[in-house]
């Protein structure tokens, strides 16, 4: 064997005789290939043949330099060698060696590495002759083994096994090599594989070798496998497709790596088939090993693999044995196994779907959603979210994001376009149309969105002319009056013009020229070009052409009649002149005649007229006759068209008529165009002031808001309802976040109550304002509820109030409105439920007391249940014992009984005054009430006297408390720091619960608080001044103010009026 680290360059000069001079028969080479090998060795070698197909033999790259060397050295050889060399090169297959320094295991030749030697002289060639026999033998073996033995490539996995096989082959061939060397015709030198290291093999030409063509050689024998049944390709099991996960990426065949197909035509077909089977089995096992080990083992066992070690004998294939075993099993077990397999597959599919959902969930989606959920008005956060989902492949996440965003900002027409384009990319046309319809309903004045939608319609329904035209008509009806709708009109005209439907184009221009738009001049110029460049019969309607034609002939007839009458007048005047001239001529003629007579008489000339006279008379006659003929011809021509021309026959139009019809058609539109120009001029300044006609969350400038208000006032003053509504819609797109413009539109629509369809318009405006753009404005919701209640839609009104109550809780005005709506519709049980709900849910004692008072009145006056009203007030008083208003309301309800219960009223007063924390002023107040009540309704004088004593004691204590408060340093500092007098506790507490709790309980109906916001300083019942809190001096004669109490400064005197003063609360 050759030493390691050397390269081998072996030449296989075709299949030839093994002797050096005489050609052996082709059959002599057959035993040296495979017939001497055992069946076991054949099986192993067949496996190696399959591996040999994967080796890349770079024949072309190595063949060129050696061919060049042979060609350069050929002139130095003898002629017999030149002829032999050229014949050999046609059959030689060059086996390239690996690069220098490659290990023996990576060599491409099975007999080890041999150094590459070059011969430069003829002596080297002579030395080569002595080694011709051995070279021929080795080259033949190399050529044979190229088809029967695997070549060792750089990527083989079992190099050691292959090396041992190759060494075994060489050792088995040593006897033959010795016999060949001992023969007479062989060379004297021993040629073995080791000696080739010193030999020159660059020009390995063998002189005595007979060249045999490949057709004369026997076919390569196929490796035989003992006890193997021959089967066709159809009988072999097909490679089963691996079960890939659902999220596996689909790639095309172009993206797959190129396969190395270096197999020659002489390679056997059977190893290829087995290799394909083995590769399919290996790929299936590799892909399914992680998730389906059990199923993979079953599938791989069914494939036939001759090289795999099995415990079964070679008498039968494993697949056949398995079939026999399966046939022996009962059919029921087979069915059960199949069912179990199906169930397992279903479970695996379900698990894979769940895993796929979890896996497909976008990683950063929650981060973007968190930003907009925390602040739904964060427009920038919404844009980031939509940009993120638009770039991902999760359709459900994208739909959810777009739907939520557009529910908050439906006037962003650009995102409707993006949403529709996203659905179009997904290939779902139905969803794309739904998105377009939703967008056009939300923002019908978006010209760009309409154009985008119409392009989509034309691309999908281009053949349906009727449908496309209906969509264009729908578009111009929705936003055709918009001042900047020129692009839409131009697109409509262009579409009709492409199909050469010029009469429809003229009809569109008739509508467009009457609308003030930004490109009004261009539209009229285009219309003129259309009329002048095409025949009037295809541009104008037949009725219009016939009418204009009749007008033309009528004008011509009137012109002819006028010209004939003028001609008559001219002819009459000219006839008079002619008569005078004729008279003069006659006189001249008479004179001439006399002279002629005299001459004839004198001369004796002939008788008759001269030629001049005859000519003159003929000229006069001819003049008269021509005048008559012209008059008759003109009158005939004028009467002929009216009598004989068929105006409906447009084929008889002449050039003069066509010119007249065009001029008249254009002039008629020019009048409309002039009116449009004036309308555009009046609106141009307002249109120039609109700097942002689209929607955005950023606030508008004051100049922009003022311009919109002035523009709306201008259109309202003009009185065109359709144009006013279009302008309002344009304004609301740019000013959607300003509720004043919504209110302005509602007030305008309320002025149109007598007109039809106004109710639906008002309801739609309320819906958009309250549900979309201003969902947290109570004022708009209260107005909407009142509108629906006026339309007798109590259910809708209650729903509106319930929604705003949930969004803006703890608003007393909303609570009262909800209760009263239910009361007006007669749902008294619902009223009780709402009263109890609000009383129990409120945390403010003052608000709870106010609600309890109203609830008691409701029970007394509406439900006629006074005892239930007293019970409600009693519960409220127990919750807030210091609430003066609740106690006074209880006294009032007791007084409204048919028979006043003295004991009941006195108990209420005594219980309230018996509190330990009662203020002196409040105690004085209730003592006064008790005295007044007993004076009017008391049954005994003793009770009245006791009440008077209690009042005097209360006044004394109140006076002492007043002096202490006035004499305290803090009191002096506070009084000196303030400009005006400080009201006492009695004044501040008059009918106001004596504290700040009630001050928070109020709500304000005034216009100063447009959203009925509940402020801490807004009192439910505004605190009264001392003059308002004091009673009138009805009982001044009682003298309760004496003793200096009434003389106190600051208006803190107790001038008590009649007890019924708290009736002012009703």
Curated annotation (Swiss-Prot):
Residue spans of the HAT repeats: 393-425, 427-459, 463-498, 685-717, 719-751, 757-793, 1029-1066
GO BP annotations, alphabetical order: mRNA 5'-splice site recognition; mRNA splicing, via spliceosome; regulation of alternative mRNA splicing, via spliceosome
UniProt keyword list: mRNA processing, mRNA splicing, Nucleus, Phosphoprotein, Repeat
Compositionally biased region (Basic and acidic residues): 274-301, 318-358, 575-602, 957-966
PTM annotation (Phosphoserine): residues: 122, 148, 158, 252, 308, 313
Gene Ontology CC entries for this record: commitment complex; nucleus; U1 snRNP; U2-type prespliceosome
Segments of skewed composition (Low complexity): 967-978
Gene3D superfamilies given in the database record: Tetratricopeptide repeat domain
Record protein name field: Pre-mRNA-processing factor 39
Main function: Involved in pre-mRNA splicing.
Acidic residues bias spans: 48-64, 226-236, 245-256
Compartmental location: Nucleus
Region listing for Disordered, in residue ranges: 1-76, 145-358, 552-643, 951-985
Principal location: nucleus
Gene coding for it: Prp39
Ranges that cross the membrane: none
Ranges of Polar residues composition bias in the record: 171-190, 200-211, 303-317
């Amino acid at each position: 064997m050759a030493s390691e680290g050397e390269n081998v360059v072996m030449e296989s000069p075709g299949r030839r005789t093994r002797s050096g001079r005489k050609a052996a028969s082709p059959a002599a080479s057959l035993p040296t290939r495979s017939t001497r090998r055992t069946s076991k060795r054949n099986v192993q070698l067949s496996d190696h043949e399959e591996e040999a197909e994967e080796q890349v033999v770079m024949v072309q790259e190595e063949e060129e330099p050696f061919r060049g060397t042979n060609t350069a050295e050929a002139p130095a050889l003898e002629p017999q060698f030149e002829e032999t060399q050229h014949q050999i090169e046609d059959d030689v297959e060059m086996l390239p060696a690996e690069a220098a320094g490659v290990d023996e295991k990576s060599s491409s030749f099975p007999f080890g590495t041999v150094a590459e030697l070059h011969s430069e002289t003829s002596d080297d060639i002579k030395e080569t002759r002595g080694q011709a026999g051995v070279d021929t033998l080795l080259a033949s073996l190399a050529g044979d083994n190229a088809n029967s033995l695997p070549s060792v490539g750089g990527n083989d996995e079992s190099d050691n096994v292959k090396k041992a096989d190759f060494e075994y082959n060489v050792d088995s061939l040593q006897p033959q090599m010795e016999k060949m060397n001992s023969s007479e015709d062989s060379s004297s030198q021993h040629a073995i594989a080791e000696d080739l290291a010193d030999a020159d093999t660059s020009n390995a030409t063998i002189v005595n070798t007979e060249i045999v063509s490949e057709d004369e050689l026997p076919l390569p024998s196929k490796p035989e496998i003992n006890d193997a049944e021959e089967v066709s390709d159809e009988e072999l099991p097909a490679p089963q497709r691996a079960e890939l996960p659902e999220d596996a990426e689909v790639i095309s065949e172009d993206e797959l790596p190129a396969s190395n197909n270096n197999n020659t035509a002489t390679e056997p077909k059977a190893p290829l088939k087995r290799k394909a089977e083995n590769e399919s089995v290996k790929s299936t096992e590799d892909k399914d090993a992680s998730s389906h080990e059990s199923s993979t083992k079953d599938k791989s066992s069914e494939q036939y693999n001759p090289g795999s070690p099995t415990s079964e004998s070679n008498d039968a294939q494993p697949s056949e044995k398995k079939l026999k075993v399966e046939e022996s099993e009962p059919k029921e077990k087979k069915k059960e196994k199949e069912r179990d397999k199906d169930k397992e597959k279903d479970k695996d599919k379900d698990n894979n779907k769940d895993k796929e959902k979890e896996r497909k969930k976008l990683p950063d989606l929650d981060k973007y959603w968190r930003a907009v959920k925390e602040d739904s008005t964060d427009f920038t956060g919404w844009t980031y979210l939509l940009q993120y989902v638009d770039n991902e492949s999760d359709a459900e996440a994208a739909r959810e994001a777009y739907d939520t965003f557009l529910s908050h900002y439906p006037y962003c027409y650009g995102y409707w376009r993006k949403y529709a384009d996203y659905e179009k990319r997904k290939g779902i046309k139905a969803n794309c149309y739904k998105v377009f319809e939703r967008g056009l309903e939300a923002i019908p004045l978006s010209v760009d969105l309409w154009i985008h939608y119409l392009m989509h319609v034309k691309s999908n329904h281009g053949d349906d002319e009727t449908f496309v035209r209906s969509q264009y008509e729908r578009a111009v009806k929705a936003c055709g009056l918009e001042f900047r709708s020129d692009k839409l009109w131009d697109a409509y005209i262009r579409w009709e013009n492409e199909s050469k439907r010029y009469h429809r184009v003229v009809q569109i221009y008739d509508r467009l020229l009457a609308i003030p738009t930004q490109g009004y001049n261009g539209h009229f110029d285009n219309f003129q070009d259309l009329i002048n460049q095409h025949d009037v019969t295809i541009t104008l309607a037949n009725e219009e052409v016939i009418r204009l034609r009749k007008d033309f002939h009528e004008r011509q007839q009137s012109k002819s009649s006028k010209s004939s009458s003028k001609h008559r007048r001219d002819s009459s005047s000219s006839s008079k002149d002619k008569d005078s001239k004729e008279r003069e001529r006659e006189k001249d003629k008479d004179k001439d005649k006399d002279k002629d007579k005299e001459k004839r008489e004198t001369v004796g000339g002939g008788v008759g007229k001269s030629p001049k006279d005859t000519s003159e008379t003929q000229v006069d006659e001819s003049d008269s006759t021509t005048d008559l003929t012209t008059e008759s011809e003109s009158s005939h021509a004028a009467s002929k068209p009216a009598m004989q021309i068929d105006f409906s026959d447009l084929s008889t139009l002449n050039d003069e008529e066509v010119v007249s019809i065009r001029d008249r058609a254009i002039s008629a539109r020019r009048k409309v165009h002039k009116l449009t120009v004036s309308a555009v001029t009046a609106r141009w300044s307002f249109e120039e002031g609109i700097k942002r006609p689209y929607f955005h969350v950023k606030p508008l400038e004051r100049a922009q808001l003022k311009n919109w208000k002035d523009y709306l006032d201008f259109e309202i003053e003009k009185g065109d309802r359709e144009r006013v509504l279009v302008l309002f819609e344009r304004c609301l797109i740019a000013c959607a976040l300003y509720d004043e413009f919504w209110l302005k539109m509602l007030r305008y629509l309320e002025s149109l109550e007598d007109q039809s369809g106004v109710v639906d318009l008002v309801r739609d405006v309320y819906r958009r304002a309250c549900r979309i753009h201003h969902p947290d404005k109570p004022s708009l919701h209260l107005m909407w509820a009142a509108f629906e209640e006026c339309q007798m839609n109590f259910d809708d009104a209650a729903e509106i109030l319930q929604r705003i109550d949930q969004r803006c809780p703890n608003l007393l005005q909303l609570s009262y409105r909800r209760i009263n709506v239910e009361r007006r519709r007669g749902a008294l049980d619902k009223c009780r439920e709402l009263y109890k709900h609000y009383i129990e849910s409120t945390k403010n004692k003052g608000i709870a007391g106010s609600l309890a008072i109203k609830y008691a009145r409701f029970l007394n006056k509406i439900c006629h249940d006074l005892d239930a009203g007293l019970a409600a007030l009693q519960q409220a008083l127990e919750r807030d014992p210091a609430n003066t208003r609740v106690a006074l309301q209880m006294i009032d309800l007791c007084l409204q009984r048919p028979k006043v219960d003295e004991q009941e009223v006195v108990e209420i007063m005594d219980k309230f005054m018996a509190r330990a924390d009662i203020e002196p002023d409040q105690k004085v107040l209730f003592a006064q009430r008790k005295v007044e009540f007993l004076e009017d309704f008391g049954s005994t004088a003793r009770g009245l006297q006791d009440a008077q004593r209690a009042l005097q004691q209360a006044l004394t204590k109140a006076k002492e408390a007043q002096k202490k408060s006035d004499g305290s340093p803090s009191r002096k500092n506070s009084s000196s720091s303030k400009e005006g007098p400080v009201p006492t506790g009695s004044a501040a507490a008059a009918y106001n619960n004596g504290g700040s709790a009630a001050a928070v309980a109020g709500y304000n109906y005034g216009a100063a608080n447009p959203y009925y916001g509940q402020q801490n300083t807004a009192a439910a019942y505004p605190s009264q001044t001392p003059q308002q809190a004091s009673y009138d001096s009805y009982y001044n004669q009682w003298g309760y103010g004496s003793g200096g109490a009434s003389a106190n400064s600051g208006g803190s005197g107790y001038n008590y009026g009649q007890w019924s003063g708290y009736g002012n609360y009703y």
